Amino acid sequence: MKKLKNLFLILLLWFYPLRSEPINEGAYILEEIGDVLRFLPIFVGTVSLAMRDYRGLGELAVGTLVTQGVIYGLKGAFSNAHKDGVRVGFAKRPCCNSWRGMPSGHAGGVFSAAGFVYYRYGWKPALPVIALAILTDASRVVAGQHTILQVTIGSLIAWGFAYLFTSRYKPKQWMLYPEISSDFKGSSRYGVSFSYQW
């Protein structure tokens, strides 16, 4: 578990972006929250892994990767279209002279996780994840990185791919797993445990 935690922290620091300076301290804090929450698929995937829902973890990975691929493909297409003289004002970031604002990658990431939880585990567990996803979208707008249209389109793309790639979770009635323990004398014990739910 400690190795997994260290690996997560290393990945978080490695992928941490260079950020623009927002208008005020409140917007800066909100932007930081949004930057951390874009890793929501990793957090949700960790929960699926802890539940031993390997199929769900795979579906989350596929949905998130396809979403990000489509979003970054669209960003590149709109940027190239602008260079070729096509009017794509909706793709311009509000903060700067960048034409890679449509759709929002942060919104796509967090709504991949939210859509996955909704379609895999149901609406009740999805409520807090959806709230965090909406907070991330708001952080991108307040920070001046995206318009409302850009985060909405990114969110809808992610939700659509979550719908396509996610199946309903059906817990297994039985489990077979290895058991390793030691007794009070320090001797190791190895075995196999079987459990069945009625």
Feature locations, PLM:
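Transmembrane helix-loop junctions in multipass membrane proteins, especially transporters and channels
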Residues: S79-D84, Q145, L149, K170-M175
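Outer-membrane beta-barrel architecture
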Residues: S112-F116, G160, S193-S195
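Outer-membrane beta-barrel "beta-signal"
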Residues: G186-W198
